[in-house]
Amino acid sequence: MVSQVVNMKGMIPSIVADINVDLAKASFTKAGIAEDQIVIVEDEKAAEAAIQEGKYVACKSFMVACKTPSIQAVVDATGSIPIGAEIALNSILNKKHIVMLNAETDCVVGPILKKLADDAGVIFTGSAGDEPGAVMGLYDFATSMGFDVRVVGKGKNNKLDYDCNPDTVAEEAARRGAAPHMITSFKEGTKTMVEMALMCNATGFVPDVRGGHGIEANVKEVPQKYSLKEEGGVLNNYGVVDFVNGIAPGVFVVVTHKLKEVRDEMEYLSMGPGPNYILYRPYHLCSLETPLSAAMAVIEGKGTIVPKGGLVADVITVAKKDLKAGEYMDGYGAYTCYGLIEKYETAKEMNAVPIGLVDRKTKVLKDIKKGEVITYDMVEIDKSTKL
C-alpha cells in the first residue's frame, strides 16, 4: 500500500508502524524512498518533528500514528481482531479517521466503533479494494439508479474445505508466498463469511441460509440461479448475500427494475433476458485501493462501507474436530474451528459464540462434536482484551 500511495497526488504515507520496525522501514525503501529520508522514532513528538522536516517515519507502536498531530487518517492492516479494535479506538479518541483493512475486527465490533467515530466527528470505514467495499460501490451505483437490488455477493476462488488446517495447506501456502493460517482461513471459508457479514451490516441484507448457498456458476448464469425457488433458482428470499464459485476475484449485485421499459432496455443492452440482471466487477485490488477510502474520509467526510446500525449478520463458530473439555481452542484459520455466516438474531437466540471472540485462550468446558455450533455455555472466553 505504501508503494501505491507514494505515487498518488495529494497523499503522503507519513508513518508506518510495525512491531518489527525493520519491516516498517522496508515498506518505505521498497517504495523507492531513500534511507536518509526515513526516521525511526519511539514517540509522537519525534514523529511530528520528522514529518515537519519532510521525512518518513517508521516505528513499532501504532499509538505513534494515532497521536501524531499531522496525521489525518490511520489504516489498520494488522489482521488482528483485538489489536485492530485498539487501533481503531485510539484513532477515534485522537480525532483521526480510521480505515479498516481488517474485516475481522469490523465484523465483531464495527457498529460500536462506527458510533464512537460519529460521536467524535470522524469517519470509521471499511476499505475500498476489499470485497465488501467493492460490493458497496456496485450497490450504491445500482440503488442510485433506481434498481431494486436483490442479491449482493462475491466470487470464491477455491471450494470449501472445512477440514483444512495450516499443516494440510502448507505446501500451497509456500507456493503462493502466503501464511498457512491465511490460506486456511480462505479454504475453510471463514474469510468469505466475514466479508459477507460486512456486506449484510452495511446493506441490511441477510444470508438466505446459514453459510450461504455457494453456487457454482459463471457470470451469465448468476442472475437465474439467484432467483427464487419458484422461479427456478435456489433462493428462499431476496435481499440476501451469498458467494459464487466460478467468478473470483470479482464481486456482484443482482438487480431488477419494476418498469418493463427499463427491463427491455437492459435486454437491448445485452444484460440478459431478465427479470434479474448481474452488475459485475471482475476485480478487487485489495490494499492498492485502500488509499481511496482514506481520501474519501478526509476530503469528503464519507465512508466506503459502514455499518447501518447494529449487527445484521454474525459469523458463528463451528467445531472443526471433536473437542474435549479442558482443551484450548485457537481461532479461525487454524485447527479447532471455522466460521459460518448466520442472521444476527438467530445467532443470538442460539447463544452462538462469534468466531472473532475465539482465540488461544478460549477454554473448552464440555465435550464438543465436530460440526457442532459452539455456544457460550461450552467455552470460557478470554476476557483480557478490549473486545
Give the residues covered by each predicted segment:
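C-terminal catalytic/substrate-binding lobe primarily of soluble NAD(P)-dependent oxidoreductases
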Residues: E171-L387
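Structural detector of well-ordered beta-strand residues that form the stable sheet scaffold
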Residues: C59, V99-M100, T125, R150, ...
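N-terminal glycine-/serine-/threonine-rich beta1-alpha1-beta2 phosphate-ribose binding loop
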Residues: M1-A88
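Generic secondary-structure signature for well-ordered alpha-helical cores
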Residues: V6-G10, T29, I33, K115-I123, ...
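Rossmann-fold NAD(P)-binding glycine/threonine-rich loop
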Residues: T78-N94, L101-V122, S127-G129
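Short, ordered loop/turn segments at secondary-structure junctions
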Residues: D18-V21, M63, G79-S80, N102-D106, ...
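Rossmann-like NAD(P)H-binding beta-loop-alpha module
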Residues: A117-G121, T125-K187
